Amino acid sequence: MLQITIRSGVAMHRFLPALLLGAALLFPPAALAADKVLIVLSGEGRDAGKTRPGYEFDELSQAWLVFKANGLAVEVASPQGGPVEPDKYNPDEPFNAQLLADGAAMAQLAATRPIAGLRASDYRAVYVVGGKGAMFDLPRSQPLQQLIGAAWANGAVIAAVCHGPAALAEVRLADGSPLVAGRQLTGFTNEEEALFGKKWAKEFPWLLEDALRQRGGEWSEAPLMMPHVVIDGRLVTGQNPYSTVGVAEAIVRGLGRTPVARTPGRDERSMALVERLRGGDAAGAARTLKQDPASYHVELIGMLGFYQAKAADVDLAALRPALQTMELAMPYMAEPQLKLGIAEAHLRLGDRSRARTLVLEVLDASPGMQQAGDLLKRIDS
């Protein structure tokens, strides 16, 4: 399940979502009818992220739907205002399709409010959406820094997901200290950046994890691309896109509300299944997936395990759950790269026989596949 870390004083406790009903006690109550959330988007994007990176539409749509379902008013802003462009995304994902069908929401996205024209006192919460564009225009926007600082001083919940915490890096409190100093938080990790941020990372002003650590933030992270939300008082941060719903519901709780019941999406169910596997119940996770594979995003599970195995390198303790995750997806995926990834993991763990069997299966289906042939040579060397 989604991992959520709540900080209260100096003690740290980990809770499952079902135990978070008391989290609202960490925040000041607000008048329900007046609760308004400001969503901040990067305006950097061009050409669906091809020539300049933008924001992540998935991180916008999933949070927006949570906010609206819980009766919160929503406004959207960007550093310069006007239309903003997301990176490439799947419009057929149910949460994206639902937002795209909302005419009022799309009108806001076509004419986002410029940050400089906003009053912090109008908002009970600020939510910063990620995407690699957030690493460029958000941390250099002084009006945004001032708005977040003033909103924090007014008692607002400040939240960000994935690369969104870049907007927090340069925020200063009234005494000149960084907002993040001494506070538990998370965001897109250096490990995740090394695998998924290569195109733009060389242009970043800094790596997000490094910047927040250097400014005194107490960094927290889960394994690669696993959902992870950190709550420290009124500061709520999420590690990656799969933390979006957890962040949004933490904001709802922070405003004194109990999130309405909802059916988890396919990606959420898939991540929860992987968490179950990583918690020691690989057999139970496999049985659950076998009962209804269509309710899960099997390709996501396979890809997650593949990249976790790649990131594990020589860390065999990290490699084993990555291998189990790939094997969870393998019966439902015909992708030869996944089977080769599993073979590679077995080889690294010392099981040459199993690795060889898997590679031969790939070569039987694709006799000329050079990558499989090269791996077989390594196994037999």
What residue spans do the PLM features occupy?
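Alpha-helical and His/Cys-centered functional microenvironments
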Residues: 6-7, 17, 350
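Detector for intrinsically disordered, low-structure N-terminal pre-sequences
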Residues: 9-10, 23, 361
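N-terminal signal peptide c-region/cleavage motif recognized by signal peptidases
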Residues: 28-29
